[in-house]
Amino acid sequence: MKKSLIQKLGLLGVVSFLSYTAAVVFAPLAYPGYNWMAQAVSDLSAANAPSLALWNQLSALYNACEVVCVTIVCIGIQGQKTRLLRTGIYLFAVMEWISAVGYRMFPLSDSGYAGAFQDVMHMVVTALVVLLSIVSLTVIIIAGIKSRDCCSYGICAAIALAMMLVGAMGMKIVPSEYFGVVERFSVFAATGFNAALGIHQFCMKSKEIKE
């Protein structure tokens, strides 16, 4: 069956995920001494990071495709599934937009945390992103429990939330030399779930899509 344009655009979530993965994997090559097991991913895109140029090149499709994908999903899901699921997806979309705009406006001024104004704002953006991520994913999980039609969304949301919690708790528990390992669970959770939403959009039956 021929896919509509709005279905095909859902695959931009996968493109976003691959772009982000490429940046996380290859940007350290331009950062002498970077220890991925101990350092955060955000160190790679800090304002004075030697890897910033390569990071921007590799992640060029990440933010653009991510926000387009989640916006397309919001359009495609209108009037479909349950109101609870739609609410969760809308909240997740707000989080994605805050993340895309906020981290571009306020990158870390130095690798780590230097205490400058933009570092403080970076932390504020992070707090909003984390809060909205937890709330939106929880709502989607509940929607999946309540409706069999939303079950696959709920499963994906549960996996993403579990990854976030593993990352958050792990960063407090594991030795500092393994901080980067557990932190990556958190950073890949959101972009991974975005890709899952895009795949759901692509696979949605054409009769369910509003052109």
Give the residues covered by each predicted segment:
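Terminal transmembrane helical module of multi-pass membrane proteins
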Residues: I141-E211
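Interfacial segments of alpha-helical transmembrane regions
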Residues: I6-V14, K81-V94, C150-A157
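Alpha-helical transmembrane segments of multi-pass membrane proteins
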Residues: F17-W36
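Aromatic-anchored segments of alpha-helical transmembrane domains
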Residues: T21, M95-G102, L161-M171
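Membrane-proximal helix-loop-helix units in multi-pass membrane proteins
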Residues: S99-I140
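Interfacial helix-start motif at the membrane-water boundary
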Residues: L44-A64
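Internal transmembrane alpha-helix with an interfacial aromatic "cap," most often the third helix
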Residues: L61-G88, V135-K146, G198
